[in-house]
A protein has these predicted regions:
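N-terminal secretory signal peptides that target proteins for export/translocation
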Residues: 1-16
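Bacterial N-terminal signal peptides
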Residues: 19-30
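Cleavable N-terminal signal peptides
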Residues: 25, 35-36
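Primarily recognizes the serine-hydrolase "nucleophile elbow" in alpha/beta-hydrolase
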Residues: 243-318, 621-685
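Generic beta-strand/beta-sheet core signal
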Residues: 148-150, 163, 191, 262-264, ...
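Cap/lid segment of the alpha/beta-hydrolase catalytic domain
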Residues: 155-242, 247-250, 293-305, 522-624, ...
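Alpha-helical scaffolding within the catalytic cores
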Residues: 313-327, 358
Length: 693
């Protein structure tokens, strides 16, 4: 029997609370009485503050807030570029951007170790051969690769690195491009990125598959660990590429003065990053990657929601790098941007970034060294773009001019694997997982002075809550230094009154807030309460009632992007549709492709991690409770995973006391890295968090 207003939540915590509520409303004789329920628990709509919006994709106020931040940062970068007056100014800017990029990825390994290359097989093709290669980019980190070598050994050949995009079979997926390059006389190396192809890090040998998909999911798990350690997954992807260059330089067939790179999608990301940081790259052609960060932040939830941390470098926007900065780091070397008009990397962003870099190339006499090609098609390295790219490579490598593309002879995947089992970590007993490497990276640095959480919170703030004006809302949106409160309505059940408020702040944001208090026993003690999904609902009434009976008023509120401010939309991964079949709560917060994960990564790009924005929201709620609701003392608590946030609130704001929860523990970022923990609530992702105490 279900009374009107009960909501059956599919996630476990909500289900537990439903049973708690049922227990509270069940008489000793086992009879369930709906009239009694009405007296005990307020109706569901008493907990709803905002007008519900139709389900579906939308630019929410929080997403718009993130985009506004990114555009302001992009405009600041453009002003810096416009101030460049000489080539010396440009090179100085280039050095600054390079240093920022190195800092964002956590630096590069300090020394190069032995590659220990070995060939595991060879296939003879028409005019070239394909060698199956395994080398070590770091001790115990085995890289599986294919090397395409022209049969003509009478002269040295230019070489091309082809980093793989997000394909399950990694390097093999790009064999057509590699064959075409080899047919033109290039030595080509294509390798599996970590987490793809033969380099799964979470392979279940019995099930003969990874615990995650081999497109982006392993990158998400590893990348989130890397963030906590103070680095980025891109650090190790770039290093694999640099070591691939080292390998090419050991080949007698290779002309070391003519090393080039091209790749598409995730391979385009790697091509841009490797070329930016390795001056040995002569020519670069990144495909289907270069765009504009604000535009990319605005569309990826809807068209490409999969988490890919190596593309979301911490402070990439706020540090003035962005995609144009990666092109700047190529100057004055030749670079071509290959784009798809119908790509989910917005074409207008690609055109914008290209033109900004082009102006600098032109201003200092290098106009012929930068180019762009566009194909009218979706996300792919099309034949027309490949032809333009190969012509560009030929021109700057002194190769004969050719027309058209060679017809590739595609080989089955099984013929192109480098290992016996198909997975290098299965074959190599001495292999190290990247999670181990990330842990080692952290351990080498954990002796450094600890970082205080409060210091991190108070730096890089978009809003100074303590100095903002707290005023009544009069219909005019707030300025950046205002918090405007609006009383929506009040209702009562027995002696309990629930006041619904909206706090307008940060120009665009709204915070739904409930003030729950006992009319007959007014108190000045207040507890802030929330769970991992936001403010309280009717299912949480047994928990709230305990605080009311203990003499507390309750203030419960939604953090930006959670609760009633969630986007009513399930992001569907094109690479793993099963993620879209999760119930709404779990799909929304899924760390591999959920809406919340995309909000979190957007926040990293703009320099203020979502976790700190949640803390900012709690400071706003606390100040409102003190100055408007008359709270003389404030405590905070939360059940389950949300206790981590409650603990952080009490640590940063000493005026707020933490009320402990039975069996509740706060996550420790350092322990997550030490344990190589694969998942945790994505909203608690803090770059460098393992070093925070």
């Amino acid at each position: 029997m279900v009374c009107d207003g009960f909501t059956y939540g599919e996630n476990a915590l909500r289900l537990v609370r439903l049973f708690q509520l049922l227990a509270a409303l069940t008489l000793p004789g086992g009879l369930f009485v709906c009239d009694s329920a009405a007296q005990t628990a307020p109706p569901a709509d008493a907990f709803q503050v905002l007008r519900q919006v139709p389900a579906g994709p939308r630019i929410t106020p929080y997403l718009q807030y993130q985009l506004d931040q990114a555009w302001r940062q992009d405009e600041a970068r453009q002003r810096d570029w416009e101030a460049i007056q000489s080539e010396q100014d440009l090179l100085k800017m280039q050095a600054s951007v390079r240093q920022a990029l190195l800092q964002m990825i956590g630096g590069l390994p300090g020394r190069k170790t032995k590659l220990n290359p070995r060939t595991t097989g060879k296939i003879q093709m028409d005019g070239y051969s394909i060698e199956k290669l395994i080398f070590e980019s770091l001790p115990g980190v085995f890289v599986t690769a294919l090397v395409y070598v022209p049969d003509d050994h009478s002269q040295k050949h230019p070489a091309v690195l082809v980093p793989a995009g997000h394909a399950t079979n990694g390097k093999i997926h790009y064999q057509a491009l590699c064959q075409r390059l080899a047919a033109r006389g290039y030595v080509v190396i294509a390798w599996d990125p970590v987490g793809q192809g033969e380099r799964s890090q979470f392979w279940d040998a019995k099930a003969d598959k990874s615990r995650y998909n081999l497109v982006c999911a392993e990158h998400a798990v590893l990348g989130n660990l890397a963030y906590l350690a103070g680095a980025n997954l891109a650090r190790w992807e770039i290093w694999d590429g640099m070591r691939a260059v080292d390998y090419l330089l050991t080949r007698p067939e290779v002309d070391g003065e003519r090393i080039n790179i091209t790749g598409t999608s995730g391979g385009g990301t790697q091509a841009a990053l490797i070329a930016a940081l390795d001056p040995r790259i002569k020519v670069a052609v990144p495909s289907c990657y270069i765009s504009s960060l604000p535009m990319r932040m605005g569309n990826r939830i809807f068209v490409d929601p999969d988490s890919d941390p190596e593309q979301d470098l911490f402070r990439m926007s706020s540090n003035g790098v962005g995609h144009p900065g990666l092109l700047l780091l190529m100057y004055p070397r030749p670079v071509m941007v290959a784009s798809a008009v119908l790509d989910f990397f917005p074409i207008e962003g690609a055109r914008k970034s290209f033109r900004e870099a082009q102006r600098l190339y032109e201003r200092f006499g290098n106009a012929n060294r930068i180019a762009m090609t566009e194909g009218y098609h979706p996300h792919q390295y099309s034949d027309e773009n490949q032809e333009a790219a190969l012509d560009f490579l030929d021109r700057f490598n002194g190769m004969p001019r050719r027309r058209g593309l060679a017809e590739p002879k595609l080989l089955p995947d099984k013929d192109l694997v480098c290992t016996r089992s198909g997975q290098v970590m299965v074959d190599q007993s001495d292999s190290r997982s990247l999670a181990e490497v990330i842990r080692e990276y952290y351990q080498e640095r954990k002796s450094q002075p600890a970082i205080r959480l409060s210091k991190e919170y108070y730096e890089h703030r978009a809003m100074r809550v303590e100095n903002s004006k707290l005023e009544k809302f009069n219909g005019v949106p707030p300025g950046e230094d205002q918090i405007l409160w609006e009383l929506i309505s009040s209702s009562s059940t027995g002696d309990v009154q629930i006041d619904k408020y909206v706090l307008h702040h940060s120009r665009l944001l709204e915070m739904p807030l409930l003030f729950i208090h006992n009319i007959s026993n007014e108190t000045q003690k207040t507890v802030l309460w929330f769970d991992e999904t936001g403010k309280a609902t009717r299912l949480d009434w047994p928990e709230l009632e305990k605080f009311l009976q203990s003499g507390y008023n309750v203030v419960t509120f939604d953090f930006r992007g959670l609760g009633e401010t969630r986007m009513p939309y399930t992001a569907v991964s094109p690479d793993d549709p099963s993620l879209g079949k999760l119930d709404f709560d779990r799909a929304y917060a899924n760390s591999i492709s959920g809406v919340l994960a995309n909000y979190v990564y957007n926040s990293l790009l703009t320099g203020r991690p979502y976790f700190f924005q949640m803390l900012e929201d709690s400071q706003i709620a606390s100040r409102f409770a003190t100055e408007k609701l008359g709270a003389k003392s404030i405590a905070v608590t939360a059940p389950g995973d949300a206790y981590t946030l409650a603990s952080a609130i009490a640590e940063i704001f000493p005026e707020i006391k933490l009320l402990t929860q039975p069996n509740a523990t706060a996550l420790k970022w350092s322990e997550i890295v030490e344990r190589k923990q694969e998942t945790w609530p994505i909203q608690y992702l803090v770059p460098g968090g393992a070093h925070i105490h």
